[in-house]
Amino acid sequence: QIYTAFKSAFSDYEISVDKTELKSMLKRRGFNPALSFGAFYDDNIVAFTFNGIGKYYNGKLTAYDTGTGTRKEFRGQGLAKRIFTHSMPFLKNAGIENYLLEVLQHNKRALKIYESLGFEILREFNFFTQKKQLVVNHLSDKPAKCSIVALKSEDILSAQSFHDFTPSWQNDIESIKRAGDDLVTLGAMVDSVLSGYCVFSPKSGDITQ
């Protein structure tokens, strides 16, 4: 039912995933079924909030909205807001201190709902995409002073100091560890010292870090 509900709720959005991709996404984002909630009609999920749980802000236990959606024919009934209100006592009882979510800026309906619930915008993300055949890599023409080697996720734990920003929830080191073999990690070694790295999904082309 989870995949059917997700596919139906996002059928008119710029989101398209198959069952395998949804499973990988939920695993990577720390999906917790016991702390996720839905609205049902005739035993079918018509609206839902899938929550991921982890330590994000200053090590505090945080819930992350992995996906909130409502089937088109059930929109306009305030189901998302009712689900969120219903979930709060359960999340607090589980020790959740923060609730984090992301929303597309042009989704004015969702923005209005979240603002009415007391959410504040902390930062904005840019999202870039390109067809792989149109990506131009000028670096391949230059002599390399480093060697590229395959790494494991634990190999980059000490390299988090390389960041000049805080990655989003789904790109955070904890999400990378949860993803396991769904992601590939490559490191740039100079004199056997890690000088840079890249984490990506070979299936989707997503560059994680």
What are these regions (language model features)?
Residues 2, 19, 116-204:
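Amide-forming acyltransferase catalytic core, primarily the GNAT-like/NAT-type
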Residues 38, 44-53, 62-64, 69, ...:
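Conserved beta-strand in the GNAT
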Residues 57-58:
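A flexible loop/linker signature enriched in serine peptidases of the S9 family
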Residues 67-72, 76-90, 112-116:
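Conserved acetyl-CoA-binding loop-helix of GNAT-fold acetyltransferases
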